[in-house]
């Protein structure tokens, strides 16, 4: 049942209340940004093409704020296609209207139109990011969100001498819209990108790239905070810096116990705050590669994939220790493309900080248990024009994906409006299953090919305050980065093989598990998360491999209003885009 409707005048009043609520006396501010979506020519790998950008920048502008601020972003669509923007990892308390996923919480912003997002920062502190949430547009429409501690507080680690956003991404020589259209027409997988990138540059190992390679100037003895974001569409990535170790101090804008490692593995959608100490041996090399390499779990002979390594250069510039030399040193500790043991060894070491200023509150009593199978499937081809369709699909079908054997179908109007106006009937069904409709054990398809699934717009409705445990159970042969809008969650467990309800919960970490918004579920394995459904609204959950979103590896949580005004969804803004 939807929330009661309020006229525009009451929305204006609610906006005043909202500003007061997020700007109390402790010094939080309202910050304003204008984003202009435009087509801009860029050249990479000797190819020039027109791409969608924000303010002509690729990556887009960085948003700077402090914990608890309100960020107002007016998005002007001067491009040639519909678009929306999502504020990835921002909980948006009571405010799904500004969350951004197309046809989930809003209709897209049409060319020539604009929409003003109210980005409510609450408990987030660290690095997040924003990106387009329509089609494959986020390949070039994305940027960092840097959230500093509240005034009067500081980092729970030594203050860095400098902060550096490091955005990992991908570049296609072809128009990204053509890449998506081709895959949908032919029913096959998406063509792999032509290069991985670091801050939109592939690095000097690629043609026509040497002069523009991203460089980081450092001085001996200084500490640098790298704000690392995986903005890629299709790949997990390993990241390392030659001659240096890295200390992870945060993930998804929540602090972690300091973890010093030789490399990190970061999934699409995830962010990590990493300290780099510039401590090289005197007289040694003064130039070092930072490198980002694809991590893939699929059999390498099954699909085309991007086997590239993006590079940037860390250069010591202080006169006492620096000496120009030949080529930069390469990070020999960077794991191989299919090193699953290295990936698991890294992610299982992450722990929440859990101090007095940043406590851990893991729910110990669970109200709603969900076991969600993740799978790659097929759907029948459109019987019309068979000569052109499904030429590249498996066994004459087209690729699909599912959660609990339901391949999500986006509605013609957004789910949030349908819920708000109590008109969900005919738009969505409230029967997303808590368990798989067809359970497969062992969690592989035994080489017989993908299984047929079914389409549906099924959502899961939760009472306000419900404690939810979701066990993601991966039936496929690749990892899946599962992202939940509107919440951070505790990753209480993970493992290989089939999840055992009688045995595996005993292995959970309920003391200091990492607090994330995106979790990498291991292939043919499982990951368990817990969260409290105390944010009323409509919230998307999906794989952050974008082709899997298009294929249907998604669902929606609807969290009902609580009893008090502070536990109820904000009213609908009067200027929402129309479908």
From Swiss-Prot:
Keywords, alphabetical: Apoplast, Copper, Glycoprotein, Lignin degradation, Metal-binding, Oxidoreductase, Repeat, Secreted, Signal
CDD domains the UniProt entry points to: CuRO_1_LCC_plant, CuRO_2_LCC_plant, CuRO_3_LCC_plant
Annotated InterPro entries: Cu-oxidase-like_N, Cu-oxidase_2nd, Cu-oxidase_C, Cu-oxidase_fam, Cu_oxidase_CS, Cu_oxidase_Cu_BS, Cupredoxin, CuRO_1_LCC
EC primary class: oxidoreductase
Principal location listed in the UniProt entry: secreted
GO CC annotation terms, alphabetical: apoplast
Amino-acid positions noted as binding Cu cation 2 in the UniProt annotation, renumbered to this chain: 88, 131, 544
Glycosylated residue positions: 41, 82, 114, 307, 405, 446, 496
Annotated binding of Cu cation 1, by residue: 86, 483
Cofactor stoichiometry and binding remark: Binds 4 Cu cations per monomer.
Every Plastocyanin-like domain range: 36-152, 162-319, 436-563
Binding residue positions for Cu cation 3: 133, 485, 542
Domain of life: Eukaryota
EC number(s) recorded for this UniProt protein: 1.10.3.2
Residues bound to Cu cation 4: 480, 543, 548, 553
Signal peptide, first to last residue: 1-27
Subcellular location: Secreted, Extracellular space, Apoplast
PANTHER family: LACCASE-14, MULTI-COPPER OXIDASE
Function: Lignin degradation and detoxification of lignin-derived products.
UniProt protein name: Putative laccase-9
Organism: Oryza sativa subsp. japonica (Rice)
């Amino acid at each position: 049942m939807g929330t009661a409707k309020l006229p525009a005048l009451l929305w204006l009043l609610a906006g005043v209340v909202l500003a007061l609520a997020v700007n109390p006396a402790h010094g939080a501010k309202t910050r304003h940004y204008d984003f202009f979506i435009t087509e801009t020519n860029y050249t990479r790998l000797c190819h020039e093409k027109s791409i969608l950008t924000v303010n002509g920048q690729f990556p887009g502008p960085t948003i700077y704020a402090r914990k608890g601020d309100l960020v107002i972003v007016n998005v002007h669509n001067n491009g040639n296609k519909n678009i929306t923007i999502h504020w990835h990892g921002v909980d948006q308390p009571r405010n799904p209207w500004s969350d951004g996923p197309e046809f989930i919480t809003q209709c897209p912003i049409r060319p020539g139109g604009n929409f003003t997002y109210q980005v409510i920062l609450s408990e987030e502190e660290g690095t997040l990011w924003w990106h387009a949430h329509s089609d494959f547009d986020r390949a070039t429409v994305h940027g960092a969100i840097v959230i500093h501690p509240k005034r009067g507080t500081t980092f729970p680690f030594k203050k860095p001498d400098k902060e550096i956003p490091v955005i990992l991404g991908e570049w296609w020589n072809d128009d990204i819209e053509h890449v998506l259209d081709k895959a949908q027409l032919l029913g096959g997988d998406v063509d792999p990108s032509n290069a991985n990138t670091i801050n939109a540059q592939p690095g000097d190992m690629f043609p026509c790239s040497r002069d523009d390679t991203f460089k980081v100037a450092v001085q001996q003895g200084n500490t640098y905070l790298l704000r690392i974001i995986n903005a890629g569409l299709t790949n997990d990535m390993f990241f390392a810096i030659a001659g240096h170790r890295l200390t992870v101090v945060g993930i998804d804008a929540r602090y972690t116990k300091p973890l010093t490692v030789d490399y990190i593995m970061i999934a699409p959608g995830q962010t990590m705050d990493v300290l780099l100490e510039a401590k090289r041996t005197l007289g040694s090399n003064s130039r070092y590669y930072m490198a980002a390499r694809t991590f893939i779990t699929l059999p390498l002979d099954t699909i085309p994939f991007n086997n590239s390594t993006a590079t940037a250069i860390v250069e010591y510039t202080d006169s006492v220790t620096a000496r120009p030399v030949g080529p930069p040193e390469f990070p020999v500790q960077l794991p191989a493309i299919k090193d699953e043991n290295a990936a698991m060894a890294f992610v299982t070491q992450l722990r929440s900080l859990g101090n007095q200023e940043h406590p851990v509150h893991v729910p110990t009593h669970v109200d709603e248990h969900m076991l969600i199978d993740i799978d790659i499937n097929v759907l029948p081809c459109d019987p019309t024009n068979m000569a052109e369709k499904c030429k590249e699909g498996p066994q004459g079908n087209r690729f699909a994906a599912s959660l609990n054997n339901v391949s999500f179908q986006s509605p013609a109007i957004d789910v949030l409006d349908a819920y708000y106006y109590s008109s969900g009937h005919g738009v969505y069904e409230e029967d997303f299953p808590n368990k798989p409709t067809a359970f497969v054990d062992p969690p592989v398809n035994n080489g017989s090919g993908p299984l047929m699934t079914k389409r549906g717009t099924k959502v899961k409705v939760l009472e306000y305050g419900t404690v939810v445990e979701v066990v993601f159970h991966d039936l496929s042969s690749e990892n899946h980065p599962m992202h939940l809008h509107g919440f951070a969650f505790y990753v209480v467990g993970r493992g290989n093989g089939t999840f055992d309800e009688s045995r595996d919960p005993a292995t959970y970490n309920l003391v200091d598990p990492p607090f994330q918004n995106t979790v990498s579920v291991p292939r043919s394995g499982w990951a368990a998360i817990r969260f409290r459904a105390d944010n009323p609204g409509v919230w998307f959950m999906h794989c952050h491999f974008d082709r899997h979103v298009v294929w249907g590896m998604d669902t929606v949580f609807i969290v009902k209003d609580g009893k008090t005004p502070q536990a109820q969804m904000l009213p609908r803004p009067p200027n929402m885009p129309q479908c």
